[in-house]
């Protein structure tokens, strides 16, 4: 989950602070993890006035990783739910199809035509596959990804026996599908990435590089992989992103930063 800083990364003061913060966040997440194991209870609520937000956790994780982000979005008046996909999933594409059904159910229940998705790590890739390959751009207004291996990651090669891990390697079949043309994709994509994200190897692989997508890549400084889902600066930036326009006027990869 990103506890260690690779030896190739300079041990600057910023890197050490990011590593220390990651340890603190990891400890807090361990305490909260049991609270997110079960699916949340879905309650009937009045129709939403804005697109609901659906949160997607990462590999071997659960909805507890979003406790702070969810609280902040809810305080801003958004209807927020989390989708716990199976920790035993072996194929990202199957999970994306399950997500499609979950989105349809959420739209029907809230009376909204579109939703916003926020995915941490693998969850962002599940959301992107749904948007690009399963027609999800007709339902997803904005896709926000936090530390997602859009170009694949080479971390932990000893885990290659796991089919899902092989799918997030550079040039995998899934990533090749996502690199294919996606003309007319109607979803705005915002990718948050950090140079101190030890899970994303090489650094910058969490950027989205695709000529057909409306993309903004946001660099976050001094934050590790797990902290991307919990740091106040990132949470504030995600909240602003979801309050912004549904689709920018131009496509391409632009870069912003969060200090």
What do the predicted segments below correspond to?
Residues 83-86, 217-224:
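Short glycine-rich catalytic loops that host catalytic nucleophiles or stabilize transition states
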């Amino acid at each position: 989950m990103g506890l260690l800083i690779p030896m190739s990364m300079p041990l600057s003061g910023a890197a050490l602070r990011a590593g220390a913060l990651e340890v603190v966040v990891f400890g807090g997440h361990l305490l909260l993890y049991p609270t997110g194991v079960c699916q949340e209870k879905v309650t009937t609520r009045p129709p939403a006035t804005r697109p609901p937000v659906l949160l997607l956790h990462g590999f071997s994780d659960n909805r507890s990783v979003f406790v702070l982000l969810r609280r902040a979005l809810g305080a801003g008046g958004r209807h927020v739910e989390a989708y716990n996909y199976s920790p035993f999933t072996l194929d990202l594409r199957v999970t994306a199809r399950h997500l499609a059904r979950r989105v349809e159910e959420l739209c029907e229940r809230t009376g909204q035509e579109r939703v916003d998705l926020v995915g941490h790590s693998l969850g962002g890739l599940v959301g992107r596959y749904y948007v690009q390959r399963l027609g999800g751009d007709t339902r997803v207004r904005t896709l926000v990804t936090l530390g997602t291996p859009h170009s694949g990651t080479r971390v932990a090669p000893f885990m290659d026996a796991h089919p899902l891990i092989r799918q997030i390697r550079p040039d995998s079949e899934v990533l090749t599908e996502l690199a294919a043309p996606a003309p007319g994709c109607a979803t705005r994509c915002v990718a948050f990435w950090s140079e101190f994200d030890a899970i994303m190897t090489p650094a910058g692989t969490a950027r989205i590089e695709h000529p057909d997508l409306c993309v903004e890549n946001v660099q976050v400084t001094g934050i590790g992989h797990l902290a991307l889902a919990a740091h106040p600066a990132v949470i504030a930036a995600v909240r602003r992103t979801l309050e912004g326009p549904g689709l920018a006027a131009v496509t391409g990869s632009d870069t912003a930063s969060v200090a």
